[in-house]
Regions:
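Short, basic phosphate-binding NTP loop
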Residues: 1-46, 53-65, 204, 227, ...
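Acidic, Mg2+-coordinating active-site environments of NTP-dependent enzymes
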Residues: 8-14, 121, 130-284, 307, ...
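ATP-dependent carboxylate-amine ligase
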Residues: 25, 63, 190, 243-436
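Conserved beta-strand scaffold positions in the cores of enzyme catalytic domains, especially
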Residues: 17-19, 42, 69-71, 133, ...
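Phosphate-binding loop of NTP-binding sites
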Residues: 13, 26-174, 178-191, 305-306, ...
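N-terminal leader/targeting and accessory segments in enzymes
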Residues: 1-29, 33, 169, 177, ...
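Short, ordered loop/turn segments at secondary-structure junctions
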Residues: 6-8, 74-75, 117-118, 138, ...
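Short loop/edge segments at beta-strand edges and connector loops
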Residues: 4-6, 19-21, 73, 115, ...
Length: 436
């Protein structure tokens, strides 16, 4: 059978044809009927940055409470039993519902799922039954796909305007860009709106105090004050943690268990993840930041830990929004002391052209073609008190060059660079001692 648009020419086909004004939406609903089962409670999270972390945190909170929970998105499907890699943040409807049915069959009752703008725009999520939705923030991204920023934002808003049923929970970071429009859309849909953050009404953030690589949060919920030792760095992780807590609380969990669970959560893979440090104690972090806003926030998060210089290695993807490239360059120069511009996933584009667009807006930056070479140079340049951020690829285990995916990991490149730096330092010390 072929599912086709109302105006599609299908007379020559020798198989049954089902016409629909919205064939993508129809496919999603057909997939939902075919694979009817899904976890009882499904919470979707959308926004430019933070989706992966919020989904991971919510899964961990539910697990800590004793629920069978999973998360689905950029880093794959994660359950208590293991991980499954996915090709897309939001899979096509047939694949998605096949996974949902499998999770339900395994006994998973609670699922946190990322709702990407592509997935929302292409109606991949339309057949799902949601208990809650969350909004993190909205900044520039995916303008290679969406014709305008407004079109991109409208795709995100579909979650609250169309997919969540009236009465469902909507958790919104009140301090984020776009929050007012999302709140209005949720109220128009008659959703149960819950806002979090300094300007929030459900969870009010009173203060943040840095304690090493942890943060002490003071929050108020339903008239009670709570102190939380969040084991993560960065103000953006505070926002992500509060959104995930708001989802858990709004879906019935008790505040004592939720806020206790936040003290034990682990960051999502490749999200401001500490990899190791040099012999001089200079730490190196890997982060998925691939938008100007995400890069700024990651650098701002690490700045307090750099008593000396803050270094960053990054590039931009090929065949994607070209307008981001100068913005990324400006962001790096404004917030880091040493900037290394290298390759990300060049895809079909000439890598040098991508780097040139970044370098034009990043005076003083160092251009190095090979990503592993750039990481090695940056690591070798670290001195006591320095911090290095390797941004853009995060959890990814491949680099797309042309149409080929070459095995590559920032984690492995950093580990190799750290080992080489230590060996070089040891060799230098040994040579110095022999000449003493």
């Amino acid at each position: 059978m072929v599912l086709a648009g109302d105006n599609a020419k299908t007379d020559a086909l020798s198989v049954p044809v089902l016409h629909s004004a919205e064939p993508r939406q129809a496919l999603a609903h057909l997939a939902a009927r075919f694979y009817a089962a899904q976890p009882e409670t499904v919470a979707a999270v959308t926004g430019t940055n933070g989706k992966t972390s919020v989904a991971a945190f919510l899964r961990q909170i539910w697990t800590a409470i004793g629920l069978e929970a999973a998360s689905l998105g950029t880093v794959g499907i994660v359950t208590n039993k293991g991980e499954t890699v996915l090709a897309h943040t939001t899979p096509d409807p047939v694949t998605l519902h096949k996974y949902l049915a499998a999770l339900a069959a395994e006994g998973v009752t609670h699922l946190a799922i990322e709702a990407s703008s592509h997935g929302l725009d292409q109606r991949r999520l339309d057949g799902m039954r949601f208990s809650a939705g969350a909004f993190t923030n909205i900044t520039r991204d995916h303008l290679d796909y969406h014709p305008t920023f407004e079109d991109y934002f409208q795709a995100k808003l579909r979650l609250f305007r169309e997919l969540l049923s009236p009465g469902a929970l909507a958790v919104i970071d009140a301090d984020s860009p776009g929050a007012e429009q999302v709140i209005q859309a949720a109220q128009d849909r008659k959703l149960n709106v819950s806002t979090v953050g300094q300007s929030g009404h459900a969870i009010v953030l009173n203060s943040i105090a840095r304690e090493g690589f942890k943060q002490r949060l003071s929050v108020t919920f339903e008239g009670r004050d709570f102190s939380i030792a969040l084991p993560l760095a960065g103000a953006f992780q505070v926002s992500n943690a509060l959104v995930s807590a708001g989802m858990a609380l709004g879906l019935g969990a008790s505040p004592d268990t939720v806020f206790s669970a936040l003290a034990e959560i682990r960051g999502a893979k490749g999200r401001l993840e500490y990899i190791g440090e040099t012999a001089l104690g200079a730490p190196v972090f890997v982060d998925y930041a691939h938008t100007p806003d995400a890069l700024v926030k990651a650098l701002q998060a690490l700045r307090p830990y750099a008593s000396s210089r803050l270094h960053v290695v990054f590039g931009c993807g090929g065949d994607r929004d070209t307008g981001k490239r100068p913005e990324m360059g400006r962001a790096a120069i404004a917030h880091a002391d040493y900037v290394y511009v290298t390759d990300d996933n060049p895809r079909s584009e000439e890598p040098a052209v991508i780097r040139r667009a970044i370098m034009a807006a990043a005076p003083g930056a160092i251009e190095i073609a090979g990503r592993a070479d750039a990481i090695a140079m940056a690591t070798g340049n670290l001195k006591r008190g320095d911090v290095l951020l390797v941004a853009g690829k995060g959890h990814e285990t491949g680099q797309i060059i042309g149409k080929t995916v070459i095995p590559y990991s920032d984690h492995e490149a950093v580990a190799s660079a750290l080992a080489a730096a230590r060996n070089a330092r040891a060799a230098s010390a040994s040579t110095g001692a022999s000449h003493g």
